[in-house]
Amino acid sequence: VNPMRIVWELSSRIPDNAIVTADSGSAANWYARDLRMRGTMRGSLSGTLATMGCGVPYAIGAKFACPDRPVVALVGDGAMQMNGMAELLTMAKYANQWHDPRCVVCILHNNDLNQVTWELRAMGGAPKFVPSQAIPDMSYADFARSIGLEGITVYMPDELGSAWDRALAATRPIVLDVHCDPEVPPIPPHATWDQIKSTTEAVLGGDPDAWRMIVQGLKTKMQEFAVGRRR
């Protein structure tokens, strides 16, 4: 699944009074670029602090502050393995105190510390260093169900819409575990020449996912160009 589509599918469905939290990493990129705020929606993220592991705790705090509003957390799998899974236990403990039970933890599951991988490529010209960047695979939906929450796993893009519909209508907190492509570049449209040069050096330096990087990078830039022309 293209990670941009995860947030794009959410944006057209999310209630006007929802609170959205985003963890640090590439999840924050897609939150900023693809979610359209409206109504009384509110958003929260760590900003320039870039603190990993904040997404699920922020969501829990939002539910305590506004127990009558739906909450959505956008979190990477690296942050989930840092502390997010432990925070799901906290969520399960206190969920019955919330007037509106809807609390969705959407996990961008790519088995990669993705933001740092792309920082190495775009800022350091270094190929992905798998020993430090790859993280263990697991089923976050299964873990959620094991502690009394709901869980949905998504592998294909055409499953996303119905999965979001189900998650946003759940009667208790739910984990939406979306397997997504780590090679979609979280690079802004105004990427500098130095960033492009460094990324090219990373490709030439033997990045293990070089071909997919090139394909997804070209697709992303072509889509941005097409949108710009339509505007």
Residue ranges and their predicted role:
Residues 166-231:
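Glycine/aspartate-rich loop-and-adjacent alpha/beta segment that forms the canonical ThDP
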Residues 41-47, 73, 117-131, 145, ...:
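Short beta-alpha connecting loops at secondary-structure transitions
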Residues 30-36, 55-57, 84-87, 115-121, ...:
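Short acidic, glycine/serine/threonine-rich loops at helix termini
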Residues 24-26, 109-112, 179-184:
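Glycine-rich beta-alpha junction loops
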Residues 1-63, 226:
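Active-site diphosphate/adenylate-binding microenvironment
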Residues 65-166:
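Conserved thiamine diphosphate
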